[in-house]
Amino acid sequence: MVYSYSEKKRIRKDFGKRPQVLDIPYLLSIQLDSFKKFTDQDPTGERGFEAAFRSVFPIKSFSGNSELQYVSYKLGEPVFDVKECQIRGVTYSAPLRVKLRMVLYDREAAPGTVKDIKEQEVYMGDIPMMTDNGTFVINGTERVIVSQLHRSPGVFFDHDRGKTHSSGKVLYNARIIPYRGSWLDFEFDPKDALFVRIDRRRKLAASIILRALDYSTQDILDLFFDRVNFKIKKDSLVMDLVAERLRGETASYDIKDSEGSILVEKGRRITARHIRQLEKTNTTELEVPVDYISGKISGQDYIDPDTGEVLVSANAEISLEDLAKLSLAGIKEISTLYINELDNGAYMSDTLRIDSTTNRLEALVEIYRMMRPGEPPTKDAAEALFQNLFFSEERYDLSKVGRMKFNRRLSIDDDEGTGILSKEDIVAVMKNIITIRNGNDEVDDIDHLGNRRIRSVGEMAENQFRVGLVRVERAVRERLSLGDLNELMPQDLINAKPISAAVKEFFGSSQLSQFMDQNNPLSEVTHKRRISALGPGGLTRERAGFEVRDVHPTHYGRLCPIETPEGPNIGLINSLASFARTNSYGFLETPYRKVIDGVVTDQVDYLSAIEEGRYVIAQAIVDLDADGRMMDELIACRHKGDSTFMGAGDIQYMDVSPQQIISVAASLIPFLEHDDANRALMGANMQRQAVPTLKADKPLVGTGIERTLAVDSGVVVAAKRGGYVDYVDASRIVVKVNESELTPGEAGIDIYNLTKYTRSNQNTCINQRPCCSMGDPVVRGDVLADGPSTDLGDLALGQNMRIAFMPWNGYNFEDSILISERVAMEDRFTTIHIQELSCIARDTKLGSEEITADIPNVGESALSKLDESGIVYIGAEVKGGDILVGKVTPKGETQLTPEEKLLRAIFGEKASDVKDSSLRVPNSVKGTIIDVQVFTRDGVEKDKRAVEIEEMHVGQAKKDLSEEFQILEEGVYGRARNLLLNAGFTEDQLATIPRSQLLVQTIDDEAKQTELEQLAEQHDELKADFDKKFEIKRRKITQGDDLAPGVLKIVKVYLAVKRTIQPGDKMAGRHGNKGVISKINPVEDMPYDENGNPIDIVLNPLGVPSRMNIGQVLEVHMGAAAKGIGDRITAMLEEQRELAELRGYIKEVYELGEEVQQRVDIDSFTDDEVLRLAKNLKGGVPTATPAFDGAKEKEIKEMLALAGLPTSGQRRLFDGRTGDEFERQVTVGYMYMLKLNHLVDDKMHARSTGSYSLVTQQPLGGKAQFGGQRFGEMEVWALEAYGAAYTLQEMLTVKSDDVNGRTHMYKNIVDGNHQMQPGMPESFNVLLKEIRSLGINIELDQD
């Protein structure tokens, strides 16, 4: 493998044995691709805005004299960029403008004669736009739209598993689910009649819908039944024989062949052997006794030719009397329905008997009554209702997917078709459910991923947009029918509000539009790759059963079987597997390598769950020879959802990677294959809660996916193009681009501005730091700057800590964690949290609130940190209770004398009395002010601080743009110099020419002269562009802010809090091994090894065996080896050993291991590169052991030996307090530990007095309300059990809701009198009132 300059800085030693056939696809593509499809112009009109507009337009007036047609649309540019939107608290959106054409037809002339056409571009609201990282900024906060897994449209056959009826009989049902429109259900009842439901309303006989489709009884019988024909003879009947139909029947007469010999005696069961004999004798007719027909069902109406009387009606049972009547009427042949209890039930025949309707109109009326109970049905209304239900494109749409699923399920060859149902479709579904009831077909598995599809952002936004358009359509149609259209333009007809409202509602408050989890880069990526079965049109927690939540065989390579929440959402919220993607229909696909005759090729095919069932697929861990041929005779593989063994020749596909089945979070866990799945689930979930530490530390034991994840998450800055680093400081990186990657006429400079100390959604700190130096060569994709939780471009969620597995004085009882004071001293787990505190000045009835430093009754010291505008300085250290923004609010007016009123009226003083309503630092918070922002309403005078901030921002913007312009200008002049040198100018000549004159020189060579003129033009464009950009930026900064009604001013203060680690904080490893810190121990008391190196963290060994997460032990051993090798490299550097020796040792490290795919050619590195690599390896050699393909025990031992450590992974330890050696050797090594966002500071809370609930007068609950602790029934039982009567009385009265008692108590405590007088608890009064409200009076006797 060829490494770039920046990749050579630190190379992760990879133990992967399998070749990487396919790189992990871009992790955010599910979000970005979906939204791109929504916003991109689509000429076919199948998706996005285009599809929505075409489905609603043209809108015709009721009279048909005018219509509004859609021409085209375009999305404008967002007014503010993403960062500005976040600061201002507005939505990052672009205006949608649609070109509409209004056509007026001439009433007097021939139909279709156009009288007038008007075209106009109409504004149709703002559409939130997706940022480059797949998020939306809505009202200043970053949100993610989670993809939804819902039941695919189409037809599904299922049964109730015998749960509906007490007998346990299995009742089958079929359901046609459209993309939008009414659901159509068919179901059997316990008596085997077929019923239909529309939109889950009351059921009707299924034949009613057929009658409504204009089928007669005769048509229905012809559709669903075969016939048995009889010829009527004098004393017997002759039946047309289809031998196969006799199978399973008991012969009620002797069956003879054509020669008269008996084949089946009367009373015997007819078997397959008898049928073969009948077929051999070519018997086509069979004589049967007359009573054989009794009870059979007539296949048609039989009418007396003379009188016209119906002798036997269709679907009626034929009796012997009926037969006599038929023969009297001269009818010689009769046909009955072929019905067989085994595989041809009389279901439709039974249904027709239940059906009371006889013709189409009656059926339509019956359907109308069911859909609109209480409304009188008319013929037209009933017709229209039924037509609109399933046969109108406006009301019903199966969608492309639905039609494909429908046709495939019913074995119709063509995947294409209309979005509405046809008569044939409904009949085909009914025939299929009868086939299933007859036992000739299987029901569907609704949890199969071929029957569930993904609905992503773009599709959901399109649906919501269409909802808004439909609302507008109604209004437009009414307006087209009213008034004089000659005066109106399209703009006058369209009101954009309903569209904006629908879109805003979806992005702002839909269940699937979620506040982005921004703890760390992993949590961001995972949130964007989340697949939820909940939400509108999906399941609900309460109704979802075990089957839906369970792992299904089709999840393989599509949804992760590990990563899902614990709790009520388990299995309903899933994560996309690493390589999965959605196909054009929205079904999940996963990649496989093609196998031909036992040889694996490099051809990769993506298969959906439906397609996968047809193939035999081997796992990725199959042994292959050098040519890719499978070596084993029998190979473990999957076929139709089952695991089995097959020969190499039968294999058709093979997995692309062992990590294919798991999500990115699970594939970050090293030695995952050694962990129990439950613990792996916790490990995957807890990594998302890791707080970014002050200084990120790459994991020594990783899995090789860390870099991919960090780059794809967008928190690091990756180079867009190659070149070299021209300039670096803390907030900007400038890259001079390679000539080969430039587009003609471009300056050739890429500028990357870094994000500094901004607040994330979870109040953690987002900060980017450059990790390149000036002059460094850069390749496209190289990491230039690290973000939160990344280290040299690798994801780094925690810290590598020195671990020992041993008990220590009970401080690691029940998973507690004992840590060394050194960890806290070195700030290993110190995190920065940024809080945003807002102060809002409103216009009240009594006058305006004012932000000022002039606050009544506040001492000088409390105002010491405020400036003259009453706003805190940046850099001030503040603690709980300090004033951040001084604000005064007018008080309610006291009763004024007439004289005072007169003075008020003259001098216009609104309110002389004001009260202090300043913004203060919350209790228990201590930190530093890092930023202040002031937003002032348009038309309100800006205070001094706001003007200062504005000037600072304008200055900063000018500085940034000037520097950018200078760099670009320098690039232009540089190219001009090179051009002039090539054209014959000397260096001395150029030195005398002023820089501004370089671009106006004259050259003899015409081509070069043209090029120089182009550069001059480019320079002028750059200058004009700079002026324009600066003016736009300045206008944006200085314009007034669009604040909510009644708000005059908002001041936002950003407070950075530094949190060191302390007892009560929650920590975890990556294997689900979590615990709370019990004690921070002095370094001198910690156990230490023979070299005197103390342990950082002591974990309980009892936490390993029962949890079955052995991966953590292997990680500790591998970590020890990785750190040991780093220590040896450090020693070599300190001893200044020969470079060849160092190079040899590093080479030995990277070449260790059997069949390892990674090849690092250390010999090709320059001496400087080797030294830089060695310096970066001093802290330990980072290793990668990919899931299911990681390091073997033997390789770990070899690594330990190479580090000069005991291969057992255990060492002697000594007690830090006594110096004595511990009894036995202890497992010591390095484990990657995370500090989770469950900090004791956020949870610790105590209350003396505070707010009370209005009705019960009990204290509120929770830290946010400054509430109390609930003293529940079990706690009451405990006090009762101990007989602590007075404590119990105190808890239930004065400490809770005895209003008078607690007031007295407070007085008594102040007076030093420690007694209490408990009274009546308020909740008892509430109970009395509740009972009285039921009409029962209770009065209490006073003693």
Curated annotation (Swiss-Prot):
GO terms for molecular function: DNA binding; DNA-directed RNA polymerase activity; ribonucleoside binding. SUPFAM superfamilies: beta and beta-prime subunits of DNA dependent RNA-polymerase. Gene3D superfamilies: 2.40.50.100, 2.40.50.150, 3.90.1100.10, 6.10.140.1670, DNA-directed RNA polymerase, subunit 2, domain 6, RNA polymerase alpha subunit dimerisation domain, RNA polymerase Rpb2, domain 2. GO terms for biological process: DNA-templated transcription. Keywords: DNA-directed RNA polymerase, Nucleotidyltransferase, Transcription, Transferase. CDD domains: RNA_pol_B_RPB2 (cd00653). Coiled coil: none annotated. Pfam families: RNA_pol_Rpb2_1, RNA_pol_Rpb2_2, RNA_pol_Rpb2_3, RNA_pol_Rpb2_45, RNA_pol_Rpb2_6, RNA_pol_Rpb2_7. The RNAP catalytic core consists of 2 alpha, 1 beta, 1 beta' and 1 omega subunit. When a sigma factor is associated with the core the holoenzyme is formed, which can initiate transcription. NCBIfam families: PRK00405.1 (NF001616), rpoB (TIGR02013). DNA-dependent RNA polymerase catalyzes the transcription of DNA into RNA using the four ribonucleoside triphosphates as substrates. This is DNA-directed RNA polymerase subunit beta.
